UniProtKB/Swiss-Prot annotation:
Enzyme class: lyase
Summary of the function given for this chain in its UniProt record: Ulvan lyase involved in ulvan degradation. Ulvan is the main polysaccharide component of the Ulvales (green seaweed) cell wall. It is composed of disaccharide building blocks comprising 3-sulfated rhamnose (Rha3S) linked to D-glucuronic acid (GlcA), L-iduronic acid (IduA), or D-xylose (Xyl). Ulvan lyase catalyzes the endolytic cleavage of the glycosidic bond between Rha3S and the uronic acids GlcA or IduA, producing oligosaccharides that have unsaturated 4-deoxy-L-threo-hex-4-enopyranosiduronic acid (deltaUA) at the non-reducing end.
Family indicated by similarity: Belongs to the polysaccharide lyase 25 family.
Signal peptide: 1-21
Binding site for substrate: N46, N109, K112, H130, R191, H195, Y233, H265
UniProt-annotated binding residues for Zn(2+): H195, H251, C253, H265
SUPFAM superfamilies hit by this protein: Sialidases (SSF50939)
UniProt keyword annotation of GTP-binding present: no
Organism field: Nonlabens ulvanivorans
GO molecular-function terms, A-Z: lyase activity; metal ion binding
Protein name: Ulvan lyase
Length: 472
């Protein structure tokens, strides 16, 4: 009798274990079939931004995306629009930031990756820099902050699974911005150090194997009338033909202790400017086609490149695009000085060149939030915007103008999340309609972010098992 009871217990245990195993297998299979609308959950901090760009490139049927992941290292993923297949994310390099637990600022956020594909099919990223440090050597074009600017390249064309880091760009860079011209020339723009540094570019004519020495195009220098230095924040993009276009605002980089403002050094920016770099002849010019003496100083910028003087309110993050005739549109975030170390809430202001003068658009109906600008014709202009609604709903939307940018109306919502917010990338380079922009969802209580690839049909979905990278 005792033996029978013992055997019965064993049989029940085996049965229960088998059931439990079967349940786990069913759950595993269901998880692999369940789709979510994010492609990865390991975005970290401000995982993407407008300034480090492009964060994504569409090429030969595939969209490639890059973002900041755990420990501020760069990650790259891809989506095949024909097969609906995701690959990655793969860690593409190791940042010198994000590893020091003793730092007061745990997440630096300045070294997010910019991505480019060269004419041979190799994928490039620039990442990891916030101006470099003194032990890296002498910075002849500015001062120092943190991190180390790095350049990594895929080991095989169009294959993002393996990477190598090349020592061929300045390690003092930050805010990396990549541009590839039609002839294959690659330009890497960045600030050569911390706030009190020149903005420069390096050029490659051999698919990023080598780069020229840094060339300054925006000059930092000491002010003589106040205790501060001139500093800049440009946003660089492709124009028409051989042109590179630049929108930028001015940072008055006050001394920590100065006689003019008791707040000391604060993120105070003013004005918005525009200029063009003709890469065919190497000349810089303003919107009136007047040549500019480079590197550009504050005095010359005010005289020749000013879009709008904004002396009292604070500005942030200029963006620009041109219509098919080369007429530029410029937008910049503007918020009031509230006598604090930050400005009040900022809203996009939009300006357009009519061939004779800069005109200010009516954007009073735009919600507060950051975004990118797309000009598709002389009359059609779109703004891709992140914002929070009055009901605390994070939203990514598009606002369209059909009157050349005079006014904008909300036309499409790509994504909404309750009790969340988003950080947004610039528009993907040469975007597929289904994959125009990358966003990271900000949730309370965690520094990790769900990453979304958004297009005209909303977010591109992925299996839950593949998207939950942090559980691997």
């Amino acid at each position: 009798m005792i033996i029978k009871q013992y055997l019965l217990k064993i049989s029940l245990c085996v049965l229960l274990l088998g059931c439990d195993s079967a349940k786990k297998e069913i759950s595993k299979n269901e998880n692999s079939k369940t789709e979510v609308d994010y492609f990865a959950d390991n975005g970290f901090g401000n995982a993407v931004a407008l300034v480090q760009h492009p964060s994504g490139v569409y090429h030969n049927g595939i969209t490639y995306v890059a973002y900041q992941g755990p420990l501020e290292d760069p990650y790259v993923a891809s989506y095949n629009h024909e097969t609906k297949e995701w690959k990655g994310p793969f860690k593409a390099g190791i940042s010198e930031m994000g590893k020091d637990p003793s730092r007061k600022k745990k997440i630096d956020n300045h070294g997010k990756p910019a991505l480019l594909i060269d004419n041979a099919g190799y994928v490039h990223i620039a990442f990891g820099g916030h101006g470099g440090m003194r032990h890296h050597g002498e910075n002849t074009l500015g001062n120092y902050s943190y991190g180390k600017n790095l350049h990594a390249v895929s080991k095989k064309p169009y294959d993002i699974s393996e990477w190598e880091t090349r020592d061929n760009v300045s390690l003092f860079g930050t805010y990396s911005q990549f541009i590839k011209m039609d002839n294959g020339d690659i330009y890497l723009f960045y600030r050569h150090g911390a706030h009190r540094s020149d903005w420069v570019y390096q050029k490659s004519m051999d698919n990023g194997v080598t780069f020229s020495e840094p060339v300054s195009f925006l000059k930092h220098k000491r002010r003589t009338n106040i205790e501060a230095e001139d500093s800049w924040y440009p946003w660089v993009s492709r124009g028409n033909a051989d042109d590179i276009i630049v929108a930028f605002d001015y940072h008055i980089c006050r001394d920590n202790v100065n006689a003019q403002d008791a707040r000391g050094h604060i993120p105070e920016r003013h004005n918005v400017y525009y200029m063009v770099f003709d890469t065919k002849n190497g000349q810089w010019k303003n919107v009136k086609n007047e040549r500019l003496q480079m590197p550009l100083t504050k005095e010359m910028a005010d005289e020749k490149t000013l879009v709008r003087s904004i002396p009292n309110d604070w500005t942030f993050q200029g963006i620009t695009d041109v219509d098919p005739d080369g007429n530029p549109h410029v937008a910049v975030l503007v918020g009031p000085d509230i006598n604090a170390r930050r400005s009040g809430p900022k809203r996009l202001q939009h300006f357009r060149w009519d061939g004779q003068q800069w005109l200010k658009s009516n954007t009073a109906n735009l919600p507060r939030g950051d975004g990118d600008l797309e000009v598709t014709s002389a009359t059609e202009v779109s703004i891709y915007l992140e914002n929070k609604t009055s009901n605390d709903v994070g939203e990514i939307s598009r606002w369209d103008s059909f009157n050349g940018g005079e006014s904008f109306q909300k036309s499409k919502v790509f994504l909404q999340r309750e009790n969340s917010g988003f950080v947004i990338s610039s528009l993907i380079d040469n975007p597929h309609p289904d994959a125009r922009i990358i966003v990271a969802e900000k949730e309370e209580g965690t520094d990790f972010r769900k990453m979304y690839l958004l297009g005209d049909n909303g977010p591109i979905k992925r299996s839950k098992k593949e998207a939950q990278v942090l559980n691997d």
